[in-house]
Each structure stands twice: as structure tokens, then as C-alpha cells.
Amino acid sequence: MKRVRVIGAGISGSEACYQLLKRNYLVELFEVKSIKKNPIQTNDMFANLAYSDSFHSNEITSAKGLLKQEMRLLDSLIINAADYAKVANEPLLVDRYKFQEYITNYLRSHQNLKIIEKEYITIDDSVPTIIATGPLSSVNLENEIKNLVGESNFNLFDKVEPIVLKSSINLNYVQKSALDDKLFYCTLNKNEFEYLYNLIISAEIFVSPLPNEIKLLHDNGFRSIETVAKSSKNELKNLLQANEIRQTENTYATVLLREDDYNENFLRIVNFQTSIKIPWQNEIIKAVPALANALILRYGVMHKNDYINSANVLDDNFQLKSNPNIFFAGQLTGTDGYVEASASAIICAINVDRYLRNLPKAIPNNKTVIGSLCNYVLIANKEDFQPMEANWGLVESMNLVSYNNEGKKKLSDRAISEIKEFIKQNL
């Protein structure tokens, strides 16, 4: 029986173990939480959740809901556990204790899983290994990963800017840059700027389970849009002022959008990284006239979040380019969110199995949410890599005119067919 090592028994590590055990591997699982917990871990069970509502929509007309359905077809431990422990279906809310208990009991009772409860400090490439230690790895392992991928490819924090769908913005309020065809300026008059400013400074802030996270971010040079605004109105005005746009009554301030290098459907709202809660972010973004009816694909976040530049250091199957016996999965790869982290672990484990059986790599295509998400983090912009969560902008669009429920149902039906074909051909 072949042996594979998994580092970390969080969401992605637990999923990776399950997928490998199903494929008849002897799995060594390293987990340190019974000896040394990170600041948000509260017990010794596997797959700790910080919140009970972490699974978002269950509807297949939502990209996150469709991702869960794709994962059900791929027999995901995490989604099986969430369905078992659910207390509400839409959005999918779970009882955290039941969820963690389901996963822990299954894995601990499996005869082919060897649990090693100690800190994993030195990466040993003599054994095929999946590193899945999540956003809060131990300092020792952080240093080991830095040595493995290079310090410039390892990040301790993220500052993710909101993304809107390019085709959904109102071009009547947009000026294109004369210097860079990837830049777009959303214009605001003075009253619109004042309204935006007041929304930002009065917005409700997300309270992290990690103590002093916002202070930690600020101390390391990461400033949110609300921090800038609360410093002074003039400082926000300076941030939202483009040198190449002449200031007039209708261009008192500008919000800059930048087209993503990998996916031209994505426009990032530059400098809008934030810890503001999503309902308030939604109101703030919609207050920009050009974005009043925009489809928001993802919201801004700022986290203490360990992740590697996957597009730079991983092959297109989550395998380290410089060492084929090492794979990465979960939040560490830039798949952002519990479900997304688990999704990457499924695909990673499938490809570990294929690597050890000398079979070609296998990842679902971009007509699926799971495939488009994995392909994005593995092939995206190497220079400005940011974590990504499931959204419709990643998925091949079928040239939809509108992302209404009818259009999204078509995308969902196609994705389910594609996943079934992927399973038939590869699993």
C-alpha cells in the first residue's frame, strides 16, 4: 500500500485525507492542534470552523451553490458533513460541533489513517506530501514553506480588492485611460464623493475571530479604504484622484478599475481593500454611479492569511514545480473560503493519485466552478496574485447577455454535465 503524507487536519487537509483513503492509500496525517492551537482554534477536533454560517448559498443559480453541487458529485467529505450538520438549507448553515464531529469520527476510525499529533517542522520530500496547513500555519512551518517556494512567493497577509463584471458597468460614467488600456476611471462629482465618503466612515466593520487582526494588518503596512477615509476626507480624496483625469465639476474624484491580466471579465476596484461587512460594501460600491447596477463578483477582504503565489510555483495540478513529490491544497493555494479550500483539496488529491499511478493530470474545465476556480489560482497573474473565491466571472460565459436566474441555470446545467463527464473519464 502506497503512503502519502498530509500536513494539517483543517478543512482542506481533512478533505485530502478522505479522498486519498478512498483510493486505498496509507495516509499519515500530521496535526499539532492537540499540543499547540492557533489563535482561532477552540478544540482538538478536525476541520474547525470559525463561524456556523460559513457555507453560503446552496442554490445552483449561485456560483457558490453550484460549486457545492459539483463537490457532492465528486463525493466531498466536507460537503457531506455540512449536509449532515445543516440547520438551514438556504443559505447552508451548519452546527459547527456536529460538522467537526462527523469529520473527526470518520477520519479517526479509518484503519488506513495514521494520525501523528506533533508539529511538522521539516518538509520531507522522500514521501509524497500535501501541505494543507491553512491561513494560520505555525511560524516554523511558515519559514519552511518560504524556503521551499522562495520568500517573494509566500504571503502572510492578503488585501483583496472587490471585483465587478466588466460588462455590467455603466460606461456613461467611465473614462478610459489614455496610458493603459486596462485602466478605467469611474467619475464622481462632489456630492457623489461626499456621499461615498460618509458611507465608508459609517460602515460596520467585520470583527475577526483572530485577536487584533486589523491592528496586525495596519502595523504591517496594509491600509484599508475605511482607514484612509477615517484619517481625513482629504486623504480619501487624494487616493481617489487620477493624475491623467482633469478635475472638473463632474470629475471631482475617480474610482479606478483595473482589468485582470488573466480574466478580462474581471475589473478590480483599486485601493478598495477593506474589512467592511459585505452589506455595507455592497452599498458603497453601488454608490459609484458607474457601478450602480454592476454585478459584484467578489467583495474586498483583509486577512492574516498565509498563501503562496500558486501561479508562480505550482504546476497546473497543485504540484510544486521544483519538487514533484510536494503538493499544496486549500487556503494556502489562494482558494479563498472553506468550500473553495475543500474544492482545491479534492482536485489536489485526485492528482496526487494520478501522479503516483503515472497517469496524466486531470482538472475539470472552465465550464465548471471547481475547474475555473482551480485553473484561476494556478494560471492567474503571477505579478499581482490575489486569493480568489467561487464566482460566475470565472466560468466560461456561454456569451450570456444577462446573469439572471435563467442564464445562471443554463451555466449550472452545463457545469453538472461537465462534472459528470469528468468523473466518467477520470475517476
From Swiss-Prot:
Query: Per the record's keyword annotation, is Metal-binding included, yes or no?
Result: no
- What is the name attached to this protein's record? Methylenetetrahydrofolate--tRNA-(uracil-5-)-methyltransferase TrmFO
Functionally, this protein is described as follows: Catalyzes the folate-dependent formation of 5-methyl-uridine at position 54 (M-5-U54) in all tRNAs.
**EC?**
2.1.1.74
Q: Tell me which cofactor or cofactors this protein depends on.
A: FAD
Keyword terms of this UniProt record: Cytoplasm, FAD, Flavoprotein, Methyltransferase, NAD, NADP, Transferase, tRNA processing
Localization: Cytoplasm
For FAD, which residues are the binding ones?
8-13
Matching entries from HAMAP family are given as:
TrmFO
Q: Which organism is it from?
A: Mycoplasmopsis agalactiae (strain NCTC 10123 / CIP 59.7 / PG2) (Mycoplasma agalactiae)
Its gene name is trmFO
Q: Taxonomically, which superkingdom?
A: Bacteria
Reactions listed under catalytic activity: uridine(54) in tRNA + (6R)-5,10-methylene-5,6,7,8-tetrahydrofolate + NADH + H(+) = 5-methyluridine(54) in tRNA + (6S)-5,6,7,8-tetrahydrofolate + NAD(+); uridine(54) in tRNA + (6R)-5,10-methylene-5,6,7,8-tetrahydrofolate + NADPH + H(+) = 5-methyluridine(54) in tRNA + (6S)-5,6,7,8-tetrahydrofolate + NADP(+)
Q: Which family does it belong to?
A: Belongs to the MnmG family. TrmFO subfamily.
Give the GO cellular component terms, alphabetically: cytosol
UniProt record, GO biological process: tRNA methylation; tRNA wobble uridine modification
The record ties this protein, via InterPro entries, to:
FAD/NAD-bd_sf, MnmG-rel, MnmG_N, TrmFO
Chief location of this protein within or outside the cell: cytoplasm
Q: Name one GO molecular function term.
A: flavin adenine dinucleotide binding
Enzyme class at the top of the EC tree: transferase
